[in-house]
């Protein structure tokens, strides 16, 4: 059985992701990282899911069993793990989170000693070790060689300093009222602290995690409550994070949710104006709206498209010497400040841009009006290779003739196919989506 998906290992806690699986996976990872070990220390963090305790304990057991020392830092955002792994000179970092998924799911993500998400070839090596009984048995230490673990609570300060350093020193948030929806997740302490220390008038919602309310009708996937609060409190802006705070959704002062591609496009031109956009280009994904491409083109900025997943965006950024990119879902990567999508870094750049321009959020983001786009997540029973689905090529050709861009892809973590249609005529896009949905229901026993 394949362990790794598009973003680490993920599944229902206690089922696909059991304590046994987590412990053995940690042992396999420990065996792999040992080959390049400099400090013999691995950092482990988590979000606020109840199952995080079980998985964390299992991971610590697995790592110490193969001789690794472990630093446990408790609930922290995924980008904090990436930063702290390098900052504290650890051999690797492990984040226990299923990101935006419901509380009953959990996941394990690995970072190398530079704070980068591990590449697919490394995942394959760890997976190979995982299934090698002899290697696992031989790697287990005894007596004095067994590793130790240490729980530390004060590293949050290092990450807060890093986030504040991404905000221009000459600016202050003193006259800004900000509403934060921390999704009962990993940002519940750090996000309010950063904004308060920079002088903002901060109102926080969904900041009482109980182990099972992470992402529950709140945060980046459900910004409705945030939108209402921003309007009610007459705030200047609202920010919604997801469970592990690697993505961000922006709500303007009118309570309107800003399209993710509008956030990307406007931030790109802001960086370009500051002469801080490297490579004269931005990396987005195949899901990004064509309106983003047209907007960037009008500002003489190129758009490159990567596969869906922030690690693929980052790969393409590195290959092309680009320092800015992201996904319309809210993963935005400022490579000068972070190694992965970081909701807090993004929020800092958004408020800095507002202050520098002296404009309201709604005025800034109205520059990009996305073309009508429909994304449908269809539950399926089988993942048949797309190239083997009869009639699909013909369907795609017909959509192209209608001036409709289409993208069909399976989720890497769920039994779902994502159907995307985009065009300039809303009614036509809706009509064609009905036909596409019926086609896939029949083809994939949905």
From Swiss-Prot:
GO terms for cellular component: cytosol. Its cofactor is Mg(2+). The active site is at 99 (phosphoserine intermediate). Activated by phosphorylation. It is an enzyme of class 5 (isomerase). InterPro entries: A-D-PHexomutase_a/b/a-I, A-D-PHexomutase_a/b/a-I/II/III, A-D-PHexomutase_a/b/a-II, A-D-PHexomutase_a/b/a-III, A-D-PHexomutase_C, A-D-PHexomutase_C_sf, A-D-PHexomutase_CS, Alpha-D-phosphohexomutase_SF. Catalyzes the conversion of glucosamine-6-phosphate to glucosamine-1-phosphate. This is Phosphoglucosamine mutase. It comes from Campylobacter curvus (strain 525.92). The lineage of its organism: Bacteria, Pseudomonadati, Campylobacterota, Epsilonproteobacteria, Campylobacterales.
């Amino acid at each position: 059985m394949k362990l790794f998906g598009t973003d680490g290992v993920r599944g229902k806690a206690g089922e696909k992701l059991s304590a046994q699986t987590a412990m053995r996976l940690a042992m396999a990872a420990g065996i792999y990282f040992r080959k390049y070990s400099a400090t013999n220390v691995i950092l482990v963090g988590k979000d606020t899911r109840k199952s995080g305790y079980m998985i964390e304990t299992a991971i610590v057991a697995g790592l110490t069993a193969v001789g690794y020392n472990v630093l446990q830092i408790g609930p922290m955002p995924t980008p904090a793990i990436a930063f702290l792994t390098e900052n504290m000179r650890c051999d690797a970092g492990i984040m226990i989170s299923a990101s935006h998924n419901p509380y009953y799911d959990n996941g394990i993500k690995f970072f190398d000693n530079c704070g980068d998400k591990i590449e697919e070839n490394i995942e394959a090596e760890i997976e190979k070790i995982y299934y090698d009984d002899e290697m696992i048995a031989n790697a287990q230490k005894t007596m004095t060689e067994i590793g130790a673990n240490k729980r530390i609570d004060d590293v949050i300060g290092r990450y807060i300093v890093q986030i504040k350093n991404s905000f221009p020193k000459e600016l202050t948030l003193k006259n800004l009222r900000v509403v934060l929806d921390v999704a009962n997740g990993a940002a519940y302490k750090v996000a309010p602290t950063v904004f308060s220390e920079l002088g903002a008038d901060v109102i926080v919602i969904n900041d009482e995690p109980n182990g099972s309310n992470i992402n529950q009708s709140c945060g980046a996937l459900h910004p409705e409550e945030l939108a209402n609060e921003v309007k009610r409190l007459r705030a200047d802006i609202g920010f919604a994070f997801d469970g592990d705070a690697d993505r961000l959704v922006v709500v303007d002062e009118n309570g309107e949710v800003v399209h993710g591609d509008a956030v990307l496009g406007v931030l790109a031109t802001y960086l370009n104006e500051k002469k801080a956009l490297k490579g004269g280009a931005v990396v987005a994904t195949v899901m990004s709206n064509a309106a983003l491409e047209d907007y960037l083109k009008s500002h003489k900025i190129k758009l490159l498209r990567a596969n869906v997943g922030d690690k693929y965006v980052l790969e393409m950024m590195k290959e092309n010497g680009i320092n800015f990119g992201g996904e319309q879902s809210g993963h935005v990567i400022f490579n000068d400040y972070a190694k992965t999508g970081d909701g807090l870094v993004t929020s800092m750049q958004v408020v800095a841009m507002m202050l520098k321009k002296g404009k309201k959020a709604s005025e800034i983001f109205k520059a990009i009006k996305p073309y009508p786009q429909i994304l449908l997540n269809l539950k399926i029973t089988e993942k048949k290779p797309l190239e083997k689905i009869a009639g699909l090529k013909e369907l795609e050709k017909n959509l192209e003739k209608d001036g409709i861009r289409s993208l069909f892809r399976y989720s890497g973590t769920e039994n779902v196919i994502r159907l995307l249609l985009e065009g300039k005529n809303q009614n036509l896009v809706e009509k064609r989506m009905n036909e596409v949905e019926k086609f896939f229901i029949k083809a994939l026993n949905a």
